[in-house]
A protein has these predicted regions:
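Acidic-basic catalytic patches of nuclease active cores, encompassing PD-(D/E)XK
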Residues: 1-33
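Short glycine/proline- and charge-enriched loop/turn segments
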Residues: 1-4, 60-65, 119
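Mg2+/Mn2+-dependent nuclease catalytic core
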Residues: 61-81, 87-90
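Domain-level recognition of nuclease-like catalytic cores that cleave nucleotide substrates
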Residues: 90-122
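Short acidic/glycine-enriched loop/turn segments that link adjacent beta-strands
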Residues: 37-40
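Hydrophobic "anchor" residues on beta-strands that sit immediately upstream
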Residues: 28-29, 52, 97
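Conserved catalytic cores of phosphodiester-cleaving nucleases, focusing on short active-site segments
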Residues: 23, 42-64, 80
């Protein structure tokens, strides 16, 4: 991997780190990051009080590509639901309140992030 691919990976990591800091400030308890199954990955799994929250982080460095959350398509939402279901089964969590949030991170030229948290995004 080199060039733009590495830049995208670095940008994604920066966005996830910014999202974790943001959620911790809001008193979320982070329980897992990068939960993977065959179908894909959930970026962050956390508790917001007694609700288990599956968080998709989307990061952009330029506004020309649109706002980050626009890339959470219906098919991506379906994929995240299936992965979340697998997480619940694997961890024997049964019938607990859950929701799906999106954290949108826009990285400015000076490296400063702007974060938008969309609770119950889908």
């Amino acid at each position: 991997m080199e060039g733009p691919q590495i830049d995208r990976i670095k940008l994604g990591r920066e966005g996830e780190e910014a999202a974790v800091r943001f959620l911790k400030k809001k008193r979320f308890k982070i329980v897992e990051r990068g939960f993977r199954m065959l179908r894909g990955e959930i970026d962050i799994i956390a508790y917001d009080r007694k609700t288990l929250v599956f968080v998709e982080v989307k990061t952009r460095s330029r506004a020309g590509f649109g706002v980050p959350e626009e890339s959470v398509t219906f098919s991506k939402q379906d994929q995240l639901r299936k992965i979340a279901q697998g997480y619940l089964v694997k961890n024997r969590l049964g019938d607990i309140p859950c929701r799906f949030d999106v954290v949108s991170v826009s990285i400015h030229d000076d490296g400063r992030p702007t974060i938008r948290h969309i609770e119950n995004a889908f």
